[in-house]
């Protein structure tokens, strides 16, 4: 059991980091998708206005 502890600690740390990065990745995805939709809507309204 002693040999498993360092590996388990490293894995737990890696898992915590991965969860944190996935959270950042989702935030970026939301921003990018929101910006893309915003740009498309802006172009649509801009072409109607002119």
From Swiss-Prot:
What the entry lists under SUPFAM superfamilies is as follows: Inovirus (filamentous phage) major coat protein
Kindly report the protein's main subcellular placement as a broad class.
Answer: virion
The domain of life for this entry's organism is Viruses
Provide Cytoplasmic-side residue ranges: 43-50
Supply the InterPro entries for this chain. G8P (IPR008020), Phage_M13_G8P_capsid_dom_sf (IPR023390)
Q: Which residues lie on this side of the membrane: Periplasmic?
A: 1-21
What's one GO-annotated cellular component?
Answer: helical viral capsid
UniProt keyword annotations, A-Z: Capsid protein, Helical capsid protein, Host membrane, Membrane, Transmembrane, Transmembrane helix, Virion
Q: Where in the cell is it found?
A: Virion; Host membrane
So where does this one cross the membrane?
22-42
> How does the record say this protein sits in the membrane?
Single-pass type I membrane protein
Function of the molecule: Self assembles to form a helical capsid wrapping up the viral genomic DNA. The capsid displays a filamentous structure with a length of 760-1950 nm and a width of 6-8 nm. The virion assembly and budding take place at the host inner membrane.
Q: Which family does it belong to?
A: Belongs to the inovirus capsid protein family.
The record's note on quaternary structure and interaction partners says: Homomultimerizes. There are several thousands of this protein in the phage capsid.
Protein name, entry field? Capsid protein G8P
